[in-house]
Regions:
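C-terminal transmembrane-bundle signature of multipass membrane proteins
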Residues: 160-173, 181-214
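Membrane-interfacial loop-to-transmembrane alpha-helix junctions, especially the N-terminal start
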Residues: 13-24, 73-86, 146-153
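Membrane-interface helix-boundary motifs at transmembrane edges
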Residues: 10-11, 65-79, 134-146
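Non-cytosolic membrane-interface motifs at loop->transmembrane helix junctions
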Residues: 41-51, 102-114, 173-185
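C-terminal ends of transmembrane alpha-helices
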Residues: 29-37, 91-102, 156-173
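Membrane-proximal helix-loop-helix units in multi-pass membrane proteins
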Residues: 85, 89-144
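Hydrophobic cores of alpha-helical transmembrane segments in multi-pass inner/ER membrane proteins
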Residues: 22-26, 52-65, 115-131, 186-201
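Short, hydrophobic transmembrane alpha-helix segments
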Residues: 35-47, 66-72
Length: 216
């Protein structure tokens, strides 16, 4: 099966502000509309959580593949994609609740093993980042002006927007509405993180993070 047209369409969508905003808002509105007909879709391990996991998995995979395919491992683009892939892998494990997939002990062991893998990946990314930290921080204005950073940051804000619903900050709000609010904001956030992973990062590829070598 040829997925090239789908990939090209998604990439084109990710480059359009109106397209990205429409996709995120439509997904959130559709979730609410579906919930009104099927009120169980926001329960644990139901439709909304599976869609969230799907978008997270796609975002993590795209970032990971782009980092793997980056020819210059000293470029800012490599660090951005590798770091975001590692971060989203952690979010994915948090979202999946693998130990709840079944009663067999193997599920709990699998989740623990994946947590160890996540930790090792994060340590490896931090080891790579440490000698380049000063250079990265000096590039902050450029980094935060990049589309991938802006979309990822907005995705993070949508995740934060769901937090008050999760913690039931709004007193008097029915639990059903609070749960729906949390899941809807997270769905929009994870879709946005996926679209952000498709952003053009050519500018980041031109920036080298190679540590300065001391003169002999």
């Amino acid at each position: 099966m040829n997925f090239t047209p789908v990939r090209e369409a998604l990439t084109s969508l990710s480059r359009s502000n109106a397209g990205v905003a429409s996709a995120v808002l439509l997904s959130m509105a559709a979730s609410i509309a579906l919930w009104m007909v099927f009120p169980d879709i926001d329960d644990e391990n139901h439709l909304l959580e599976w869609l969230q996991a799907l978008f997270l998995a796609l975002a993590c995979t795209v970032h990971g593949m782009r980092a793997w395919q980056e020819p210059d491992r000293q470029s800012l683009r490599f660090l951005m994609h590798a770091g975001l892939s590692a971060l989203l892998f952690g979010f994915l494990l948090r979202e999946l609740d693998i130990d709840q997939f079944g009663t067999a002990p193997a599920w709990a062991q699998l989740e623990k093993a994946l947590r160890v893998v996540e930790l090792l990946i994060l340590i490896r990314v931090l080891i790579f980042f440490a000698p380049r930290a000063r250079k990265v921080f000096s590039l902050a204005p450029q980094i935060f002006s990049m589309r991938i950073t802006i979309l990822t940051a907005i995705g993070g804000l949508l995740m934060i927007a769901g937090w008050p619903f999760d913690k039931k900050v709004f007193h008097g709000m029915p639990d059903a509405y609070a749960l729906l609010g949390e899941e809807v904001f997270e769905l929009g956030a994870y879709l946005l993180l996926f679209l952000a992973s498709l952003s053009d990062t050519t500018a980041a590829a031109r920036i080298s993070l190679a540590p300065n070598r001391k003169a002999a």
